[in-house]
């Protein structure tokens, strides 16, 4: 089966909370988006997540969403990709919610999540 993937958001690493807020406000202003505060990050609409401290990926992360996460993981494994199992998050029912691919792609980590 071939799974479908859509861009969920782009996470951008910053040095601290002040830089994250500054960048989120700038991106919100440029693209007419609503800024939003989060615990670990500041957001510019639904598209940009400005991390309050450096996280996975030299530059940040790219989040992709898919309707069938388990099937997508199996498809990507068959393509030779590995996963960072330390990042796997599960819902209350024990189903996988999201996980990062191992390594970086153009300086970005890639986060796969359930749509």
List each language-model region with its residue ranges.
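Vicinal oxygen chelate
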Residues: 1-3, 25, 29-38, 46-52, ...
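Mid-chain, well-packed structural core segment of small domains
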Residues: 58-88
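Short Gly/charged-rich anion-binding patches and loops
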Residues: 22-23, 71
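Non-catalytic surface loops within mature trypsin-like serine protease
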Residues: 16, 66-68, 103-105
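N-terminal beta-strand motif that seeds the catalytic metal site of vicinal oxygen chelate
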Residues: 1-21, 57-64
């Amino acid at each position: 089966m071939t799974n479908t993937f859509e861009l969920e958001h782009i996470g951008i690493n910053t040095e601290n909370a002040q830089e994250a807020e500054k960048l989120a406000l700038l991106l919100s202003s440029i693209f007419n988006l609503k800024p939003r505060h989060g615990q670990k990050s500041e957001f510019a609409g639904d598209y940009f997540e400005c991390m309050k401290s450096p996280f996975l990926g030299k530059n940040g992360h790219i989040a992709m969403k898919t309707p069938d996460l388990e099937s997508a993981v199996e498809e990507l494994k068959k393509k030779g990709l590995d996963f960072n199992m330390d990042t796997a998050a599960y819902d209350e029912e024990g189903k996988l919610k999201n996980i990062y691919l191992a390594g970086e792609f153009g300086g970005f980590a890639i986060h796969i999540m359930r749509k």
